Amino acid sequence: MNIPSLFVDPFSPLLEHPTEQRAKNVAHAPKRPCNLTQTEKMLAVRNALRYIPKEHHVLLATEFAEELNTYGHIYGYRFMPNFDLFAPPVSEIGAHCEQASAIILMILNNLDKRVAQFPQELVTYGGNGQVFSNWIQFRLVLRYLYTMTDHQTLVLYSGHPLGLFPSTPDSPRMTVTNGMMIPSYSTKELYDKYFALGVTQYGQMTAGSFCYIGPQGIVHGTTITVLNAGRRMGLDSLAGKVFVTAGLGGMSGAQPKAAKIAGCIGVIAEISDTALLKRHQQGWLDVYSKDLEEIVNWIKEYREKKEAISIGYLGNVVDLWERLAEEPECLVELGSDQTSLHNPFLGGFYPAGLTFEQSNQMMTSDPVKFKKLVQNSLIRQIAAIDKIAAKGMYFWDYGNAFLLECQRAGANLLREDAQDDKSFRYPSYMQDIMGDIFSMGFGPFRWVCTSGKPEDLRLTDQTACKIIDELKDTDVPEYVKQQYLDNKKWIEEAEKNKLVVGSQARILYSDRAGRVALASAFNELVKSGKVSAAIVISRDHHDVSGTDSPFRETSNVYDGSAFTADMAVQNCIGDSFRGATWVALHNGGGVGWGDVINGGFGIVLDGSSDAARRAEGMLNWDVPNGVTRRSWSGNAKAQEAIQRAEKQVDGLRVTLPVEADEELLKKLKF
């Protein structure tokens, strides 16, 4: 990788078109719908030309118009580097500000072809999780970061670099917003228009905040979910038990690895041979077949042997569920789905009866018919799931809007006693499993060793084990100790499980006390020189405080506030002035555009006392914020956790709820 070339002026001289790179065999995003009027298409080109010096307008106006017609979006492919991107050792970046070098490393990792779903379209995961809207923005952002000082802050509006603004060393080096819309215009239909115009983008969660660490990020969460789903069924061991699901993409590709780690038989449907083969070649998917009879035979064989294995079905998930529903016996104990149903009609879900290629063509050539086929397939899929669930399978929604889109397609999924429109017969994994884990304050904390050295990551793993050992012996409830034990097992086996894809990164579900201790210990490792370069700490937006999402992260909030977004917005504001190196606030992520508000952060631990101070101050807000909100909604585990935190954190005093007597309320007349 030619790192210095990433920081040159892309207009003087004008960069050559990266012909060799464009010709490489990588997965590409489907053509996007472009239902713009002639005037709006002119506006889209005009908007892109704003970045370009006037002398290049004639040439690039034609290029941009051709891209808009061909791909449904102006990606500015000319400005894409003519080589593969990846996260190099931070010492090779050499920006004027060390914190900015670390941010550049994180951006490059999000566009690594081993990590990103559609690297040339700047999509990291989820089908449309953009890092930037176009490659011109990529170039300008890297130039700004390379030259900035620690008295400046870079501001990004949905990928667009607004510029560098004066600030202080304690301020964030970068603030990011993605997809912030006037609420009544935050619809999926209008998103297509405004993305085509180049004025907003869908950053998913860690795609647009530059904190993605490859599928490892969701392996841990999926492992925890599968283990706890088994516990809900009274299973101490998942040996010989079958978990059926769908998706082997950027995030969902974690499922076969998680199934093996959990000790069960994972069966995962995937219609894209590129996505499936990527996981097979990576070693995360053991075997695969296009033949449903072979799939069923493998399931029966490994159920009998009680051996863990990951099995891929190269075909449509609807066909898999319907075939399994034909079996007289229940072959499936656990079921879910991780297709990208936040984006159901533009590549997030592929209907039965069409090939992958036919679907990619029809979704733009005949979107009305394609939508009908998708919804018919969802009806068929949930009907097959109903049949197997009636035999004893435990099925849950993985927060990808599966049940929501089935309901929108016409399926009757509400419970008989439902008091709202989100109380489905099948639970969200947040309601049954992860909600309580978040309420305890545990969530997907992560770190990146910017040296790029495996030995540095190994030392952080060992340090994390020691900290967990200390925490599990403190005065905490047994259910909290169980979380510590689960997470210690994860970190002990992390290197053996070969989870690193891209940067030298690790994820660990941790609570407030754990995160504060980890940040302090990591900063000391950098200060002492035991770790050879700065460590970036971050988390998924899908966390205790980071996301307001009534169909996922806050689906177990029952006081009527699940459809509000104060928590996520306040979290980003609070992180920004408490010490984050960068912060991000997004519309969408997980369930989809208009249905979620979420945010994240990054902190660079450089071994300084300032870094230690900032990390402690910020982490003592970033977790308790969400625990307090969950406590206020009535969650008992959150109430215990926040009262315990009040005794440990100076200055922390929260408002605790007083529960009303149910019989008193029933006597009231309205």
Curated annotation (Swiss-Prot):
| Pfam families given in the database record | Urocanase (PF01175), Urocanase_C (PF17392), Urocanase_N (PF17391)
What does the record list as coiled-coil region(s)?
A: none
Per its UniProt record, the required cofactor names are: NAD(+)
* GO MF annotations in UniProt: urocanate hydratase activity
Keywords of the record = Histidine metabolism, Lyase, NAD
EC number(s)? 4.2.1.49
> Which top-rank group of organisms is this from?
Eukaryota
- Designated name of the protein: Probable urocanate hydratase
Record-level GO BP terms: L-histidine catabolic process; L-histidine catabolic process to glutamate and formamide; L-histidine catabolic process to glutamate and formate
For this protein, the record's InterPro entries field holds: Urocanase, Urocanase-like, Urocanase_C, Urocanase_central_sf, Urocanase_CS, Urocanase_N, Urocanase_Rossmann-like, Urocanase_sf
Q: Which PROSITE patterns match?
A: UROCANASE
Recorded metabolic or biological pathway in which this protein acts: Amino-acid degradation; L-histidine degradation into L-glutamate; N-formimidoyl-L-glutamate from L-histidine: step 2/3
Residue numbers binding NAD(+): 126-127, 204, 250-252, 270, 316-317, 338-342, 349-350, 398, 590
Please give the family membership noted in the entry: Belongs to the urocanase family.
Q: Which reaction does it catalyse?
A: 4-imidazolone-5-propanoate = trans-urocanate + H2O
Q: Which organism is it from?
A: Caenorhabditis elegans
